[in-house]
UniProtKB/Swiss-Prot annotation:
Binding site for Fe cation: H110, H114, D303
A Pfam match: TsaD
Recorded name of the encoding gene: tsaD
Sites where the protein binds substrate: V133, M134, S135, G136, A137, D166, G179, N278
Location of the protein in the cell: Cytoplasm
UniProt keyword list: Acyltransferase, Cytoplasm, Iron, Metal-binding, Transferase, tRNA processing
UniProt name for this protein: tRNA N6-adenosine threonylcarbamoyltransferase
Record-level GO cellular component terms: cytoplasm
Higher taxonomy: Bacteria, Pseudomonadati, Chlamydiota, Chlamydiia, Chlamydiales
Organism: Chlamydia felis (strain Fe/C-56)
The EC number(s) this enzyme carries: 2.3.1.234
Family listed: Belongs to the KAE1 / TsaD family.
Entry's Gene Ontology BP terms: tRNA threonylcarbamoyladenosine modification
């Protein structure tokens, strides 16, 4: 069975092929670089770029794998959550491929696919597992009874962790996206230089907006007027701010996990999303949690279509098909509270 996956939920246009053994045959990603000049993703520009790039990334994936569309058995496409225009372009393109080739099609949840990316490369994952997604748009924790079961435990109440990194990067004068650059600067700074901390939210939820504001005030000092320009800082000061911020942001997440693991009897942890590629965070969890940890490889942390094809294949084989595939910007997961699961 050969599955073709399509991903277009934000600013990456991607196509991948996964075979019957869930092995990646081809994985092509086209990133839209011009959003950097705007300091973030411009939805209309992203949609137009997907429309332009989808045919070429599909052709490239087919060429790399040495197959044609006739050899494809299933088409999987991201349909939620994400930028509605970008999702619509991907879903409609997938529908055209499915109709033209007379192949079955299945819709895939982008966030769930990030967790499946870790599962794809792991061996003998024990369930129930804690699923942690950390990206530019999401910071969510899930109870996973199996690879296809996702019940929401906790969520960010404001900014996502990746979004917070990008905004702090902007404060430090870094180009968009700023996450990887902050990690690099932090490795050269002192994480004890600034006593940053995020808001302590009751229960399992998270909050990063206060931490972001604290960093801004630390940079501006006494001149904290919102309209005042950001001062020039030495590279040493920037490195120290980056290190202190990074520690505070990740400790906020890490401190929530032991209670979740205990209350929901989690036997392993799956982590996904672009921020999961941060080596400081990986080391932090490895040093503080006594459970098997599974992170995707770097190529599967950021948005890609291999995770879409992999999860789509699994859903199809499990007969968990999507009826009436339509793009949807937001998605509401069943909560553990809905199932009367343990509360903090």
């Amino acid at each position: 069975m050969l599955t073709l996956g399509l991903e277009s939920s934000c600013d990456e246009t991607a196509c991948a092929l996964v075979d019957a053994d869930a092995q990646i045959v081809a994985n092509v990603v086209s990133s839209q670089q011009y959003h950097a000049s705007y300091g973030g993703v411009v939805p209309e520009l992203a949609s137009r770029a997907h429309l332009q790039m989808l045919p070429s990334v599909v052709n490239s994936a087919l060429e790399k794998s040495g197959v044609s569309l006739d050899d494809i058995d299933l088409i999987a496409v991201t349909h939620t959550p994400g930028l509605i225009g970008s999702l619509a372009v991907g879903v409609n393109f997938a529908k055209g491929l499915a109709i033209g080739s007379q192949k079955p099609m299945i819709g895939v949840n982008h966030v769930e696919a990030h967790l499946y990316a870790a599962y794809m490369e792991a061996k003998n994952v024990e369930f129930p597992a804690l699923g942690l997604v950390m990206s530019g748009a999401h910071t969510s924790m899930f109870l996973m009874e199996d690879p296809l079961s996702y019940k929401l435990i906790g969520n960010t109440r404001d900014d996502a962790i990746g979004e917070t990194f990008d905004k702090v990067g902007r404060f430090l004068g870094l180009p968009y996206p700023g996450g990887a650059l902050i990690e690099m600067m932090a490795s050269q700074g002192c994480e004890e230089s600034y006593p940053f901390s995020a808001a302590k939210v009751p229960g399992y939820d998270l909050s990063f907006s206060g931490l972001k504001t604290a960093v801004l005030y630390a940079i501006k000092g006494n001149n904290s007027n919102s309209r005042s320009p950001l001062p020039d800082l030495s590279q040493k000061e920037k490195n120290n701010i980056a290190a202190s911020f990074q520690k505070a942001a990740f400790m906020t997440i890490a401190q929530k996990l032991p209670k979740i693991i205990k209350n929901f009897s989690c036997r392993s942890i799956l982590v996904g999303g672009g921020v999961a590629n941060n080596k400081y965070f990986q080391t932090l969890l490895q040093n503080t949690l006594n459970l098997p940890l599974y992170f995707p490889s770097s190529k599967l942390c950021t948005d890609n279509a291999a995770m879409i094809a992999g999860l789509g294949r699994e859903l199809f084989l499990s007969r968990k098909t999507t009826q009436g595939i339509t793009p949807c910007a937001r998605y509401r997961w069943e909560s553990v509270a809905d199932s009367l699961s343990p509360h903090p």
